[in-house]
Amino acid sequence: MASKQTFLQHLQSHYQAKLDRDYCTFPDADAASGKSAQLVLLNHYELLEVQGTDSERFLQGQLSCDVREVSMDSARWGTYNNAKGRMHASFLTSAAPDVEAGYHLRMATDVATHCREVLAKYIVFSKAEIQSLSDEWLVFGIT
């Protein structure tokens, strides 16, 4: 995963961050507090992107959350369930920052492929597309 290493090395060289495997600790901005910020790679999450003119309508009919409430300032938790109500995946839905009519679904990596395949069966009837962003995006947590 060259992109992860390149990004972490950039943080190290430009922000004096200390690297430790998938953790990145930043110098203390307030030495008196004794606290420092830490960036943690959440490689157990993957992002799926749904984009296109019908993306909102498609997702509104497939997911448990109200996609109309998702904005750049507001994400929503949701699930994707089968016809019998069994949950395939739970995720956090957010607006895609670089796509006008798009959404990101952050979910566990072990269910992302299955969820993408199932949603792809139905998305062909909409003016929307779904793709994995695992090769382009990394998911980090900040402590």
Positions of PLM-derived features:
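Basic, glycine/lysine-rich polyanion-binding surfaces/domains
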Residues: 1-143
